[in-house]
A protein has these predicted regions:
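Membrane-interfacial amphipathic/re-entrant helices at transmembrane-helix boundaries
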Residues: 2-78
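Helix-loop-helix "hairpin" substructures at the membrane interface of multi-pass membrane proteins
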Residues: 198-278, 303-304
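Transmembrane alpha-helical segments in multi-pass inner-membrane proteins
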Residues: 263, 271-338
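Loop-to-transmembrane alpha-helix initiation sites
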Residues: 147-149, 203-210, 252, 284-288, ...
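Short loop segments and helix-boundary regions at transmembrane helix junctions
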Residues: 7-18, 87-94, 113-117, 123-184, ...
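Cytosolic-side transmembrane-helix boundaries in multi-pass membrane proteins
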Residues: 1-26, 236, 243-250, 320-379
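Transmembrane helix-bundle core of multi-pass membrane transporters
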Residues: 155-224, 332
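Single transmembrane alpha-helix segments in multi-pass membrane proteins
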Residues: 35-39, 53, 58-113, 126, ...
Length: 379
């Protein structure tokens, strides 16, 4: 028999891509409308500045800011992997932000207080995130506590515990932790010459390829292993997985452990590059964990798709800082970036809309064919 080929619009990957592009365009349009309402005269220039991001700078500076964007893309990608990994088993890991805090706490404290090498600091950061993920998973399986509720509560608890712990290793003259470059340079992730590709930007390290390789590894685990199949089966139908003999509660806890470890890993990949220090007086949970949710959905809940979506989200976030502050207030860059980022989380909705339209078109086509056939039989 001749193999029937699907049209491009009916392929799942193309539908995800199309839905993602619609979300991105929608976010830019909404952002532009907000700028028009606030100050019409500078709206067009502002949205162009956001879209150009670091590309607006001349050659040498462009490479420098490109490198910094990649450095911040790495932890964003890991947070997205944390969210999508948990989502495969039916868990919405909103606690990725708290797990990220735990990872930052353990990694920085090990570096500044114990003078540990970078790889030990990263492992401790992963362990801290994993323990927090395990707690959320255990609450879900043992006491049926929704992971969204426990995740939100643990986010704030972890934030303030992190502030307390890292307050012991902060700079005496500022609210920030001591800089790794001047105190424990051995805790910095090595660059292996990668910084030369980005105008000697010192924060560019092997964290970038490590994050990409981690995404590939997660894809392999989810799609090419028995464990990944069991996770997706548990997420699709909890009772059916239980009936088939799968250890559904064990899978949920293990999934949350891995998700927490990924978020903690992301924190280590950011702070151990030395690109920024932890502010011990911060009163809001870092946005990195929440942005990971948008990245995961924009990437179609695919580890490979999340690589591209993580870079795009960071690209837009960087571009938000280019808005003219003489025309708009200082918060406008964060507002525009947030609008675009969170509208990107509607990929699933637009994908469902596309599939619904295609299904209705098929039903109309089938009904028309049936009418023609009935007419032929009557004759």
């Amino acid at each position: 028999m001749k193999k029937e080929h699907k049209s491009l619009i009916r392929k799942d990957g193309f539908q995800t891509l199309l839905a993602s592009l619609v979300c991105v365009l929608g976010g830019l349009i909404v952002g532009y409308l907000v700028l028009l309402i606030i100050e019409p005269s500078g709206a067009f220039e502002a949205i162009v500045a956001v879209m150009k991001s670091f590309l607006r700078f001349p050659g040498a500076l462009k490479l420098k800011y490109f490198g910094q964007a990649l450095v911040r893309t790495a932890p964003l990608l890991l947070c997205a992997l944390s969210v999508l990994f948990a989502y495969k088993v039916g868990m919405f890991n909103i606690g990725a932000a708290g797990q990220y805090c735990a990872g930052a706490c353990a990694a920085l404290y090990a570096a500044l207080a114990w003078n540990m090498p970078w790889y030990v600091c990263i492992l401790l950061g992963m362990l801290a995130g994993a323990l927090l993920g395990m707690l959320a998973g255990a609450l879900r399986t043992l006491f049926n506590v929704n992971v969204v509720i426990s995740g939100i509560m643990l986010n704030w608890i972890t934030l303030y515990l992190t502030n307390l712990v890292l307050g012991t290793v902060k700079n005496p003259t500022s609210p920030y932790t001591k800089t790794l470059q001047s105190t424990t340079p051995g805790a910095l992730i090595p660059s292996l010459g990668l910084e030369k590709l980005f105008n000697n930007e010192k924060s560019v390290t092997i964290a970038i390829p490590i994050a990409v390789l981690t995404a590939v590894l997660v894809w392999v685990v989810l799609n090419k292993t028995k464990f990944g199949y069991e996770l997706k089966a548990t997420g699709s139908n909890y009772n059916a997985a239980k009936y088939c003999g799968m250890k559904e509660n064990q899978n949920i806890i293990l999934t949350m452990v891995i998700a927490g470890a990924l978020a903690g890993f992301g924190a280590g990949l950011l702070y151990l590059t030395g690109i920024e220090d932890w502010e011990t007086t911060i009163s809001s949970v870092p946005a990195m964990g929440f942005n990971g949710i948008a990245v995961a959905f924009l990437g179609g809940l695919s580890p490979i798709g999340s690589i591209l979506s993580a870079f795009f989200i960071q690209y837009i976030t960087t571009g938000g800082g280019n808005v003219d502050l003489q025309v708009y207030c200082s918060q406008i860059s964060s507002l525009i970036s947030a609008l675009i980022i969170y509208l990107c989380a509607f990929v699933g909705f637009f994908k469902y809309f596309i599939q619904t339209r295609l299904r209705k078109a098929d039903e109309r086509k089938a009904a028309k064919a049936a009418q023609i056939q009935e007419g032929g039989e009557d004759k």
